Curated annotation (Swiss-Prot):
The lineage of its organism: Viruses, Riboviria, Orthornavirae, Negarnaviricota, Haploviricotina. It is found in: Virion membrane; Host cell membrane. It comes from the Viruses. Residues 30-57 are intravirion. This is Small hydrophobic protein. Keywords: Host cell membrane, Host membrane, Host-virus interaction, Inhibition of host NF-kappa-B by virus, Membrane, Transmembrane, Transmembrane helix, Virion. Signal peptide: none annotated. Belongs to the rubulavirus small hydrophobic protein family. Its main location: virion. The chain crosses the membrane at residues 9-29.
Amino acid sequence: MPAIQPPLYLTFLLLTLLYLIITLYVWTILTINHNTAVRYAALYQRSFSRWGFDQSL
């Protein structure tokens, strides 16, 4: 039943749009979290590095 199947370019276009939306959403979340982490890292940098070294050993 080829009539029910959507055209190949339409499927490709939808997948591309979905990929772009997900990428933009993830990039926005990561950017906000990164900026927040950088903002607080200046206050807790020594605690974070000390905890990181303790956990790695």
